[in-house]
């Protein structure tokens, strides 16, 4: 049996520091759920979304997280942190094992442009061996909108995809639909961990390898402690979910190539007519501007109501 005991912690993130709260939540998981071997939290949940709080790799936040991992015996996936390296800032997820070692770093491939305009894109995919024989991949928030990433991670062996997220906008419903679809089309677990409080609307969710919703959280603080069975992933990929579509095999065996994906240049050429990726400006109306002095005034109709006789 290949089980991963995972706790997804939906913290109440504030614009300032949340590290003390995060640490209490992690220590609580270690006491309440002794079968859990890994905890994960939402994107930027520890320090918030200001790049002014970026630290160098191996800085004080990572050091404190490493010590916490050693003390609790848990693998810690601390959402993400803004990290400064080589004169650039990355939105980074350090993967910390139960001995407190950083076994990998994942840099967000798709910063949420144009809003994360000063954050550099990563270049590497990360899949790591986790307790229970699971293979786990990581993406960050907006990355999940690009199914090519999820399928690449699964081609590298991933059976669980962690998606730390910080979303406080109206598109959370869309994000959940995308996460669910990715679970189904790549036949894997998808754990979409949002933050609550000032900087997130919550609604973290876990989907199984058939796209089934295992649990969706509410809007407030919550801990989603689950046993994820890797055999279910392997069965779905081998036999199809409940004996239905064997999606990855079909994708593998299809003899047709995707021209747009042959190179970066081919992709850029295919979508060159979309215009620049920039902040949307004011909404422009079709009605031409007029001079206020000459613009006709709207006709005003007044109806006088007679009083009682």
Residue ranges of predicted features:
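Extreme N-terminal starter segment of soluble prokaryotic enzymes
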Residues: 1-6
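Hydrophobic/aromatic beta-strand patches that form the interior of the parallel beta-sheet core
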Residues: 7-9, 40, 77, 104, ...
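Cys-nucleophile CN-hydrolase/nitrilase-fold catalytic domain and related Cys-dependent amidase chemistry
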Residues: 13-105, 169-184
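Eukaryotic scaffold repeat domains enriched in small/polar residues
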Residues: 18-20, 29, 71, 122, ...
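CN hydrolase (nitrilase-like) catalytic-core segments centered on the catalytic cysteine
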Residues: 57-75, 145-224
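Active-site catalytic loop in hydrolytic enzyme cores
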Residues: 63, 84-159, 165, 169-177, ...
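C-terminal beta-strand edge segments of enzyme domains
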Residues: 127, 195-309
